[in-house]
Swiss-Prot record:
GO molecular function, one term: structural constituent of ribosome
Subunit structure: Part of the 50S ribosomal subunit. Forms a bridge to the 30S subunit in the 70S ribosome.
Disordered: region residues: 224-274
UniProt source species: Methylibium petroleiphilum (strain ATCC BAA-1232 / LMG 22953 / PM1)
Protein name per its UniProtKB record: Large ribosomal subunit protein uL2
Ranges of biased composition (kind: Basic and acidic residues): 229-239
Protein family membership: Belongs to the universal ribosomal protein uL2 family.
Protein's job: One of the primary rRNA binding proteins. Required for association of the 30S and 50S subunits to form the 70S ribosome, for tRNA binding and peptide bond formation. It has been suggested to have peptidyltransferase activity; this is somewhat controversial. Makes several contacts with the 16S rRNA in the 70S ribosome.
Record-level GO BP terms: cytoplasmic translation
Position of the signal peptide: none
């Protein structure tokens, strides 16, 4: 890994900071693990915008990543580490002893030629997946399940991880990167180590066009709109909101908690730190 600041040959290049990964695969991805990805620009079947600030961007296929890691007892060899345009983390192409190939989230320090294993008997090593009941307290984990057998849902982005704090008879307590402490069933699976590409936050795009390549459209301030478009809109000249900051649909937008899932509220031991 190397952080490179390019020469300021133009205003768009002046602020660019690249993170160069020389170990990534230079060729094409595994064709059997690709799926077409239809771009809908944040619109639903009626053509209405349901997700703002999405549209355009470079075409790419979806890489089918194995988040369940359910091939127990079968060792897999890492063939290569690849870039994935759909996520911030790198992915690893592994080949199991029975010949099947799968993509997994590459943990930090995983190298080509290494062997990984899944199951309750797997050793405590980066890249191995075990039930939480078999992981020592204090271990660093990623790709953690919330429901046993559903697949990893927590700590999947670049550089993230969770820490196993305690383990009870049925549930274990883990601390997330946000500071939240959560109870998770001990039969849920997790992968040892932290996610790769921890230098992702060092990258500087340098110009708006680089963000457009990723399919992100501009975010317009409400005070710059007309009254028909936003509650903050209108006025003669430059004006403030004149009220509590709200969203385009007139719900409070700063400090207003939007969590409504009461069913899983009991699994949160302490809320995240602001």
């Amino acid at each position: 890994m190397a952080v490179v600041k390019v020469k300021p040959t133009s205003p768009g290049r002046r602020a660019v900071v690249k993170v160069v990964h020389s170990h990534l695969h230079k060729g094409k991805p595994e064709a059997s693990l690709l799926e077409p990805q239809i771009q809908n620009a944040g619109r639903n079947n009626n053509g209405h915008i349901t997700i703002r600030h999405k549209g355009g961007g470079h075409k790419h296929h979806y890489r089918v990543v194995d988040f369940k890691r359910n091939k127990d007892g079968i060792p897999a060899k890492v063939e290569r580490i690849e870039y994935d345009p759909n996520r911030t983390a790198h992915i690893a192409l592994v080949c199991y002893a029975d010949g099947e190939r799968r993509y997994i989230i590459a943990p930090r320090g995983l190298e080509v030629g290494a062997t990984i294993l899944s199951g309750s008997e797997a050793p405590i090593k980066a890249g191995n997946t075990l039930p939480i009941r078999n992981i020592p307290v204090g271990s660093t984990m990623h790709c953690v399940e919330l429901l046993a057998g559903k697949g990893a849902q927590i700590a999947r982005s670049a550089g993230t991880s969770v820490t196993l704090l305690a383990r009870e008879s049925t549930y274990a307590q883990v601390r997330l990167r946000s500071g939240e402490v959560r109870r998770i069933h001990i039969e849920c699976r997790a992968t040892i180590g932290e996610v790769s590409n921890e230098e992702h936050n060092l990258r500087q795009y340098g110009k708006a066009g680089a963000i457009r390549w990723k399919g992100v459209r501009p975010t317009v301030r409400g005070v710059a709109m007309n009254p028909v478009d936003h509650p903050h809109g209108g006025g003669e000249g430059r004006t403030g909101e004149g009220q509590v900051p709200v969203s385009p649909w007139n719900t409070m937008t700063k400090g207003y908690r939007t969590r409504s899932n009461k069913r899983t509220q009991t699994f949160i031991v302490s809320r995240r730190k602001k």
